[in-house]
Structure formats: structure tokens, C-alpha cells
């Protein structure tokens, strides 16, 4: 699978993900880019799960963002509704993290759109490890990017489906 984390701290929101693509127990690729900017560069998105499914969902989310510009929550809720109810989409196996300057969301195929309350959240096979590491580092003087990178490094040390090839995207936040 993979690990994707987002950290919101110090005027930045940072999303980071590893680059490993596994097929069963075999590493097929080590430098995949699972974190990217969408929505005219105003949204960062990361995905875990089946790669083709995740790209399908990213395309759908981009269309929703075109329909509802500047409204990440609305676009995410509309995507989650489609994902849960559409005969084709509901079979897709992926999760997504998305963030803009004011909101961070986790979107699942069960129709969940979750907003984290501690400034960080993570998904994927190493998500729990990365989340715990980031939570422990949130009260330090480390920047959002430093926390995200360290949390992913810790997850990669523990999770065999996560590697140390980290891709980071960041946005300035409101407030």
C-alpha cells in the first residue's frame, strides 16, 4: 500500500507520501508520486490504495472542484456521495487525503469525509505509525514539513509497504 500524511502547523499545510508501489509482496516501483496539486494548484491531494482507482477518484475530485471552485468540503462530500452510491465507483479501493488553505479532509469509499482535530492525519498501511509519530511531534518546535518527513521515516522503518522516497507538497494556510 503506502503512507500519506498531512500536517497543519505554523502557517503551512504539508502533505507527504512515500513512493512505493507493491503488487502482492513484490515492490514494483519505488518512486511513484502519490501526492500532487490539483484544483488549479489550490489543493494538495494524496492517495493510498489501488493506484488506478486512486487516479480515477482524483479525476472525479478535480471535476467536483471545477463545479464547486474554492469549496473543498462541498466537492469532497459530493465525491463521497458518488463514490458510495455509484455502481462502478463503490468498487474502487482507495482512500484520499485532501487539503486547501483552510481545510484538511480524509475521504473514504464508505462515504466518510473526516476533518482531523489535531492538525494531522494519515492514511495507508503505515498511516497509524505516521499519525502517532506526528502527534508526538506536534508540540515540538519542528515545522510542519519536518514533522511530516520524520513521521513518514518512522512509518517506513516499521511498515514494509512504505519506503523512504518521500514527496512533499505544501500550501500557505489562512489565519
From Swiss-Prot:
- Where, by residue number, is the active site? 2
Q: Where in the cell is it found?
A: Cytoplasm
Question: Which molecular-function annotation in GO is an example for this chain?
Answer: metal ion binding
Q: Does the keyword Calcium apply?
A: no
Q: Name one Pfam family in it.
A: Proteasome
Q: Which GO terms describe its biological process?
A: proteolysis involved in protein catabolic process
Which residue windows are transmembrane per the record? none
Regulation of activity is described as: Allosterically activated by HslU binding.
User: Record-annotated residues binding Na(+)?
Assistant: 156, 159, 162
On the tree of life, the source organism's domain of life is Bacteria
Family in the record:
Belongs to the peptidase T1B family. HslV subfamily.
Subunit structure and binding partners: A double ring-shaped homohexamer of HslV is capped on each side by a ring-shaped HslU homohexamer. The assembly of the HslU/HslV complex is dependent on binding of ATP.
Functional note: Protease subunit of a proteasome-like degradation complex believed to be a general protein degrading machinery.
Put simply, this protein is called ATP-dependent protease subunit HslV
Instruction: Write down the species.
Output: Rhizobium etli (strain CIAT 652)
Q: What is the lineage of its organism?
A: Bacteria, Pseudomonadati, Pseudomonadota, Alphaproteobacteria, Hyphomicrobiales
